UniProtKB/Swiss-Prot annotation:
Signal peptide: none annotated. Its EC number is 7.6.2.11. PANTHER family: SPERMIDINE/PUTRESCINE IMPORT ATP-BINDING PROTEIN POTA, SPERMIDINE_PUTRESCINE IMPORT ATP-BINDING PROTEIN POTA. It is found in: Cell inner membrane. Part of the ABC transporter complex PotABCD involved in spermidine/putrescine import. Responsible for energy coupling to the transport system. It comes from Psychrobacter cryohalolentis (strain ATCC BAA-1226 / DSM 17306 / VKM B-2378 / K5). This is Spermidine/putrescine import ATP-binding protein PotA. Keywords: ATP-binding, Cell inner membrane, Cell membrane, Membrane, Nucleotide-binding, Translocase, Transport. One of its GO terms (molecular function) is ATP binding. The complex is composed of two ATP-binding proteins (PotA), two transmembrane proteins (PotB and PotC) and a solute-binding protein (PotD). It is a peripheral membrane protein. CDD domains: ABC_PotA_N.
Amino acid sequence: MTESLLTPLTTPASANTDKVLLQLTGLKKTYDNTEVLKDINLDIKHGEFITLLGPSGCGKTTLLRLIAGFEQPSAGAIYLDGVQMAGLPADKRPVNTVFQQYALFPHMTVAQNVAYGLKLRKVPKVEIQTRVREMLAMVQLEHLANRRPQDLSGGQQQRVAIARAVINRPKLLLLDEPLSALDHKLRLQMQSELKRLQRELGITFVFVTHDQEEALSMSDRIAVMKDGRFQQIGTPIEIYETPANLFTAKFIGETNLFKAEVKGVYPEQPDRDGRVTNGRIEVEVCEAQVQDGPTPVRNLRRPDFANDVQVGDIVNLLLRPEDLRIYDPNDKEHGGLLGRVIESNYKGSTLDSIIELTNGHIIKASEFFDEDDPSFDYKLNEGVKVSWVDGWEWVLPEEDIH
């Protein structure tokens, strides 16, 4: 009796197991005296979907090639299920890779392409037929089993490539920007398909992309890379809401950054009920004029780096477009920064407003659109006031990101 393909090989990600499958320790890679990977350390759990995210040239594809065995590290170690992979060639590792170019065999049918790896392993014919049938059903291509790759759409070809990669039940599947050649609508569809397949099969996925939306929508964790180093490793919510530095803040999603001067730092202290508060800092936003006098002091939650902050220091306030609120400049109820609308983009459920503050700084606000609310009828060059709720911002220290 053959094992069903639908039986997870590993514990699915939803079980949140803590068992480590892949361990990268002190990895370095050097080409011609240029270090392209610098002290990479990462533990990846069984059944996890983790994304290596970063701009072109950050080292993410090089790291994937080291894991796959296509290249060897200059230093450090790679452990897969506790076994050292150093020196082991790619074809000897329980790892499969899906590339941007799917490399399907044009002279073979869809079913023959998917079965190819099983035939190389001399799996019995009856078992091959069963597993191919199950795999094609899982990727919803059973009705195309006898088609040639050139007769398929881009999304269908990609699903064939994934089916061929996972039918061998690898412990680890590596995906190098497999969605980048697809159009936007199909890319969104395939994001859902990939996550569904990963969850049902329970195979650990390491996904490489430069697309922040792909990373945020599919990943259990994201490892943000720049210049051969990890900048931050965390869940999509952690990466988006609490970026570790200015690079991550600017690279992930759309960002408004405001300079502010620290006016007071207040340490943790017990409240009236004896509970310890997180403390707070007071800042004055440096960006622009406000109505009726100087910029007010804002009372903010105490950032993680508050022990290193002194009165007079400059910090960065991170606010996403959806955090900002727009008011009439004559509104007396809300304080805020003055500016004018220089562009307005209707996107169905939201209205995006590009605003130039009085000092020339350009920011973006995104609000849910309400056609019955006259306050949404912003005209170009119309004066507005921009504000936010204290506590919605994320505070980062001043740094040089170049």
